[in-house]
Amino acid sequence: MNIKDLITEERNPNTMNIDSMSTLEMVRTINHEDQKVAAAVGQQDQQIARAIDAAAKRYQQGGRLIYVGAGTSGRLGVLDAAELVPTYGIKPERAVGLIAGGKKAMLQAVEGAEDDLELGQQDLRQLHLSAKDTVIGLAASGRTPYVVGSLDFANEVGALTIAIACVPNAVISSHAEIGIEAVVGPEVITGSTRMKAGTAQKMILNMISTGVMIKQGKVYQNVMIGVQPTNAKLIDRACRIISTTTGVSTSEAMTALHNSANDVSVAIIMIETGRSKADARNLLAKAHGNVAAVLQANK
């Protein structure tokens, strides 16, 4: 399929005169188009759930979440990977974002990088990809060579491959074990896939990474117990998490956080079971980091 035939390159009939709209009309028109995104993502719920279950299994075995993409898609992958570290307390090497053209491409376009089929393979080789890993290929157009090459190499290694596109029958879907196609329709500004397509990809990545982390026990009830209290805001959040999940006062939560060496999960277990820090850590390790499982077994 030629690029001009992709739905992401079609002109949107609802925005043909956006250049003559009032500012308020522009805002309302863009918002109206954005409302289509959640519905398009929702139509892919079964595929997204499949992706979460499969990726969670690999991650539990010690694998990594590796995102590959170009342009906006690549930047969204890098963003998702980066956010998992402070949010869930995982090691930086467990979530990696690769963008065609490298770090420079995060801030400016690197001409020709996305069209290099072998570049994606080279980038993955440098990570020493294994069958335990999950590679998530992102391409709004569904055809970016950098992503295709990455997925092909990942398949050869035996890694789990997931493709996220915003067109039907995407090329990258045929190069992945699981294909997710959120068809959001023509963009407000023709071909500007940083808009609806980018929003859809971000929503899907939110679901996948959050789901995988939940299944690793990084969430207790609905709070992020893996949060790293590295600044004042996060220390306050950690104390509130401990307080609201255990019922202790804020001052008691602060003391528990200190006694647990700033480990929210350990602090909760110490409070709820009366165990020492060392015992709490051992229980948590045996339960593969699942706080709920520890508390259930030690009522």
Kindly label every feature range from the protein language model.
Residues 29-37, 97-108, 261:
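Gly-rich Lys/Arg/Thr-decorated short loops/hinges at beta-loop-alpha junctions or inter-strand turns
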Residues 32, 212-299:
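Short, amphipathic alpha-helical interaction segments embedded in low-complexity terminal/linker regions
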Residues 1-40:
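Cofactor-/ligand-binding subdomain signature composed of acidic, glycine-rich
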Residues 33-43, 109, 134-137:
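Short, basic, glycine/proline-bearing loop/turn elements
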Residues 43-58:
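A short, well-structured juxtamembrane/interface segment
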Residues 58-59, 154:
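A generic structural signal for well-ordered alpha-helical segments
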Residues 66-203, 210-216:
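Glycine-rich phosphate-binding loops that contact phosphosugars or nucleotide phosphates
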